[in-house]
Amino acid sequence: MPSKGSFQWNAVRFSNKVFCVTHAIKNSMDWDYLIWLDADTYTFRPMPASFLEKLLPEDSLVTYLGRGDKDPECGFVGYNLRHPEIQNLNDEWEDLYINDGIFKITSGWTDCSSLIHLTKKYQKHKGVTVNDIGHASDVKGHHVFINSVLGLYMDHFKGNRKESGTSWKKDFWPQSHKETKNISQLDYWKQIK
């Protein structure tokens, strides 16, 4: 559980992102998917549509970067707008922040805390599937974004990395997947410190 003074208890700060995402979902229903990408990300090489299609399975409600027992990394989240539960999830997520339900969540009040709270609830009670491209896919390390398949195309300047303008070499963990095994050898990643 985060300490009392932690940013993770700032519901107002994180409600902005939740309201942005829920508004986008409501206004994008002519599309199949909505992808949230934090503004502090950098795409360093072209990403083929086939890559995104593989990340966003038709049967999954959301695709996210899980971190095991910690809240997910929500710098990238794919929302399946054709899933029969997407509107319910969206309405319930927004409602947490409008009607103070967020304050009942004991792990934190961030967008990440509330999203994982709801997806676990939907998995348990509604039988939905989610696509965890982080720890559930055997990605190692705390900075799951760059250690996942997303690191083949993007960097996420989370936290103090904004100052340096890149992630750090120490963020990389040895990978066991064929697809990401040599990720740190891509030209972009070879230049970081």
Model-predicted regions and their roles:
Residues M1-M29:
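Active-site-proximal specificity loops/subdomain of glycosyltransferases
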Residues L37-D38:
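Active-site acidic Asp-centered loop
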Residues L34:
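Short aromatic/hydrophobic "clamp" motif used to bind/position activated sugar donors
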Residues R82-K193:
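Catalytic core and acceptor-binding pocket of nucleotide-sugar-dependent glycosyltransferases
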